[in-house]
Regions:
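Conserved blade-ending motifs and adjacent loop-strand segments that build the rim/top face
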Residues: 39-42, 188-199, 248-269
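Beta-propeller blade signature
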Residues: 120-122, 235-250, 289-292
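Hydrophobic beta-strand positions that form the internal "hydrophobic ladder"
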Residues: 8, 59, 106-107, 161, ...
């Protein structure tokens, strides 16, 4: 999800069209666009860049399956006009990152490939560096990587990167150069992945901890779970998610308890809201939000 001017844009993964556009305040549907395909105006597996302020009806996504950045004119797309999407090559070094942030010529991102916690890629110099996994995490063996899956968020104003782990109840804070500043464990007991024979796979009884992380200038927001991974594929009514808020010293601030199970959310700082996606008991996928000022 992202916001652009008075709109909220949501990526649909299940079918065409690829993007749904809502009124940012009342969440009435305004339109949709984007078809699956290999053409310059098509999409296969797009993501929004993290931390971007999209204004003037212009936004960008990167498509990991098409290895391209797509510049989108939102108004042209909604009115089905030509030349609404322009494709630009995505640097091959960063293809496959589920979280991607830009700071000038530098990209920060992560990949679930066991190479490191996150990477720093300077396009101008061509230098690509992996930031090693912290020593408090289990060392990935052979080609296995899922055990150290994580999601990151980057603050350009603070010049810091936060990493939240899928299977560990740990959060790590780094500076722009990849130096570890601080780490915290959230919860009284240590949580880590349950591994199968010869540490070759994460077992379904492993607890999910943090499935998403967002941030603004003041706070870090973690989508927190406490459910076995095997149950997460078929959420039930009693399963609830939480959004845990930390400051940039990784000190605890508060927790928002959601009435649903969700794995994706957006902090709309302009409206002081948290918007999230959840599947209802009827099997529909709906948008929900709550006011952070209440």
């Amino acid at each position: 999800m992202c916001v652009c001017d008075s709109f909220l844009i949501v990526i649909g993964r299940d079918d065409e069209p690829c993007f749904y556009v809502y009124d940012r305040n009342g969440y009435q549907i305004k339109g949709s666009f984007g078809m699956n395909g290999n053409g310059p105006s098509d999409f296969l597996f797009p993501f929004f860049f993290g931390g971007e302020d999209y204004v003037g009806g212009k936004l960008e996504v990167y498509d990991v399956n098409l290895a391209s950045i797509k510049e989108i004119d939102l108004h042209r797309c909604l009115h089905k006009q030509e030349n609404a999407v322009v494709a630009i090559s995505l640097p091959k070094e960063i293809i496959g990152s589920p979280d991607l942030f830009r700071a000038g010529s530098v990209y920060y991102g992560n990949m679930d490939n066991g190479m490191g916690l996150f990477f720093r890629f300077d396009v101008s110099s061509g230098q690509f560096d992996w930031i090693d996994f912290p020593s408090s995490l289990l060392e990935p063996e052979r080609d296995f990587s899922v055990m150290n899956m994580n999601r990151i968020s980057y603050s350009e104003s603070r010049k810091e990167i936060v990493s939240a782990m899928f299977y560990y109840n740990r959060v790590f804070l780094y500076d722009e150069q990849g130096n570890l500043q601080k780490s915290v464990r959230l919860g009284e007991k240590e949580v880590c992945p349950v591994l199968g024979n010869e540490n070759s796979s994460v077992m379904g009884e492993s607890l999910l901890c943090f499935t998403d992380v967002q941030s603004d200038e003041n706070y870090i927001y973690l989508m927190a779970q406490s459910v076995e991974e095997e149950r997460s594929f078929s959420p039930t009514a009693e399963m609830k998610s939480r959004i845990v808020v930390l400051d940039w010293n990784l000190d605890y601030v508060k927790t928002y308890s959601l009435p649903h199970y969700s794995q994706a959310f957006l902090v709309d700082a302009g409206l002081h809201r948290i918007v999230y996606i959840a599947r209802t008991s009827e099997g529909n996928t709906d948008l929900f939000y709550f006011d952070m000022t209440e």
